[in-house]
UniProtKB/Swiss-Prot annotation:
InterPro entries in the record: Gprotein_alpha_I, Gprotein_alpha_su, GproteinA_insert, P-loop_NTPase
Molecular-function GO terms, alphabetical: G protein-coupled receptor binding; G-protein beta/gamma-subunit complex binding; GTP binding; GTPase activity; metal ion binding
Protein name: Guanine nucleotide-binding protein G(i) subunit alpha-2
Family according to the record: Belongs to the G-alpha family. G(i/o/t/z) subfamily.
Entry binding sites for Mg(2+): 47, 182
Region (G2 motif): 174-182
Length: 355
């Protein structure tokens, strides 16, 4: 009898140990699962960050995958030159050479068919090269804040010689620069520093925002992207609204949301390279009339950082982790994401009582 009781006690103790072990393992496993939500207004660089995760943590894009982006590169290139041509008319600008008017008409006739086929015929490529070389077009490019133009426009158009070759295969950088509007939610999985990441890229345009809500539950951290270079631009979907003001409004609603009281907020002040180029000739007062500092990169970026961080209504209990980023620069993103991961590890272990 006594022997039976001791065997039962031993079995119960073993079961208890096993339950404790499983709970501990579950706790550690939970601490290693990271759900990241990428938020931000349209065209703030969220999808580029996702592509960088593939390049940095998943061996990048294979040759076959790169080939699949060829049609997107062609489309982005053609759409960019068309946007500049349309702006020439709106801004009442003249071409340097009158024959470019004819080229522009031919381009518009050929563009739709080429886009449907997903190619860039030699004749069309030559027309684009001639237009791009025109000083009128180049002048129109300097006034890009007055119309909607992809950030990658000059990147592709400057490299037409390479892009228009029959055997062209997009590089990793070409893929990074492609612009396709994100609709719905794009999920990416990868492992880094023994953590299992699930990253959700959510459509940034206003029409997409109602789809975000079910992503919110159990989020470890939010990476909020802001296009710093958009301080002098208006929204594609609302030409009355300054893009930076829209970003601030959205950040305010995310940062102070009751859903996110326990969530780490990481702020990526992105497109720092474009911002640095732009601030020298386009004053910050366009966006912030009260700004009295110099239009230099350091002072202007610090001012924008303060404007966003000041929106945090719970400064005593909630920290905003701010980084200046260039989403198309793999080394920069790698460095920043390394720092972000360390913050996540620390906060995650703390939440699970393991730190």
């Amino acid at each position: 009898m006594g022997c039976t009781v001791s065997q039962e006690d031993k079995a119960a103790a073993d079961r208890s140990k096993m339950i404790d072990k499983n709970l501990r393992e579950d706790g550690e496993k939970a601490a290693r699962e990271v759900k990241l939500l990428l938020l931000g207004a349209g065209e703030s660089g969220k999808s580029t960050i996702v592509k960088q995760m593939k390049i940095i943590h998943e061996d990048g894009y294979s040759e076959d995958e790169c080939k699949q982006y060829r049609a997107v590169v062609y489309s982005n290139t053609v759409q960019s030159i068309m946007a500049i041509i349309k702006a020439m008319t709106i801004l009442h600008l003249d071409y340097e050479r009158p024959e470019r008017e004819e080229d522009a008409k031919r381009l518009f006739k050929m563009a739709a068919e080429a886009e449907e086929r997903g190619d860039l015929p030699e004749e069309l490529a030559n027309i684009i090269k001639d237009l791009w070389a025109d000083s009128g077009i180049q002048h129109c490019l300097t006034r890009a804040r007055e119309y909607q133009l992809n950030d990658s426009a000059a990147y592709y158009l400057k490299d037409l010689e390479r892009i228009s070759k029959p055997d062209y295969i997009p590089t990793q950088q070409d893929v990074l620069r492609t612009r396709v509007k994100t609709t719905g939610i794009v999920e990416t999985h990868f492992t880094f520093k023994d953590l299992h990441f699930k990253m959700f890229d959510v459509g940034g345009q206003r029409s997409e925002r109602k789809k975000w809500i079910h992503c919110f539950e159990g989020v470890t951290a939010i990476i909020f992207c802001v296009a710093m270079s958009a301080y002098d631009l208006v929204l594609a979907e609302d030409e009355e609204m300054n893009r930076m003001h829209e970003s601030m409004k959205l950040f305010d609603s995310i940062c102070n949301n009751k859903w996110f009281t326990e969530t780490s907020i990481i702020l990526f002040l992105n497109k720092k390279d474009l911002f640095e180029q732009k601030i020298a000739h386009s004053p910050l007062t366009i966006c912030f009339p009260e700004y009295e500092g110099p239009n230099t990169y350091q002072e202007a970026q610090a001012y924008i950082q303060t404007k966003f961080e000041d929106l945090n209504k719970k400064k005593e209990t909630k920290e905003i982790y701010t980084h200046f980023t260039c989403a198309t620069d793999t080394k920069n993103v790698q460095f920043v994401f390394d720092a972000v991961t360390d913050v996540i590890i620390k906060n995650n272990l703390k939440d699970c009582g393991l730190f």
